[in-house]
Amino acid sequence: MGPGAARVLSKRSFTLAGHRTSVALEAEFWAALARLAALDGQTLAQLVVAVDARRQAGEQLASSLRVLALRKANEYISEVDKESDS
């Protein structure tokens, strides 16, 4: 897919605070979040519930999940950079 091509969003449903809700993200984000959850010994649903509980009022859940994936990727890159500088 080229730089200007539209990404396909994939919806997943979760129960958050007793209510069923759907979140639409690109497949790459779902894969990254599933891997992060597994590394922490959680299910994807548990990770989504935790992110939902921490987000600020008015903050979109999909955005919070994307930011988490990006932050974790940046942390990993920083660690790799530190190791390569040693």
Positions of the model-derived regions?
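Amphipathic, hydrophobic secondary-structure cores in small proteins
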Residues: 11, 15-69
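A detector of short terminal or domain-flanking linear segments
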Residues: 1-13
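Short, solvent-exposed charged binding patches
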Residues: 70-86
